Amino acid sequence: DEETHESVAGIVAGRIKEKYNLPTIILTKGKDMPKGSARSIDEYNMFEELSKCKDLLDKFGGHPMAAGLSLSFENIDKLRQRLNENCKLTEEELIPKIRIDQRLPLKYVSFKLVDDIKSLEPFGKGNPSPLFAEKDIIIERVYVLGKEKNVFKLLIRPEESYNKINGLFFDSTGYFKETFLRVYDEVSYEKFLEGVLGDIRADIIYYPDINEYNGTITLQLVIKDIRFSTN
């Protein structure tokens, strides 16, 4: 992509990988030759696959999940063809997967739970943050926040309780709307955003967190995935 600067190639590759759950390489024009960044999924060792194509590359380096590379213009199509021919990914491996620690009804979300989770930090590749799931929660209202309109604040009521809690879903790819439209139509989506659709049910994957605003401390959920269902 001649319009993308090499400094943001990794960000673009990461977003495309997240949206489509596919290994992704973004090439930019570069100063002397095309340069690129690669981002991968757990099932595809990007560094190993690029190593099989090192005769086509000027330079490359990285690890299974990410890499950087440079190559001549005439080798771009050759690299694409060889990577695709060598790819052994199955349809099952391309299904996005989120591993949860356990199902946790929202009535068990507490300040103590958040403190206990924070005591396990720092989180990273070898020590992932715990993720929980709950089914059939009720979304009373949704608010769209942020300069880019990509943060969804959900007012959630658990099925077994009248205690409400806010949930935040950060979305840079349009996934929230895409997921909603698997069950409802465009008109319903607009009504949902306007707050006139009524209660919506969903299953969520989340982790509990604390929100501090104007001296007030409240519990909130950070939602990592959502699946809407009909009432």
Question: Can you say where each PLM-predicted feature lies in the sequence?
Answer:
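Hydrophobic/aromatic-rich, well-ordered segments within soluble, folded domains that form packed cores
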Residues: 15-21
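A short linear hydrophobic-aromatic micro-motif
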Residues: 23-26, 56-57
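Acidic, two-metal ion nucleic-acid-processing modules in DNA metabolism proteins
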Residues: 18, 39-231
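Short glycine-cluster motifs
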Residues: 25-40
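Conserved beta-strand termini and adjacent loop/short-helix elements that scaffold enzyme active sites
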Residues: 1, 27-29, 103, 170
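Short, active-site-adjacent cap segments at secondary-structure transitions
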Residues: 6, 33, 107
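Flexible, glycine/threonine-enriched loop-and-boundary segments that flank and lead into catalytic domains
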Residues: 1-14
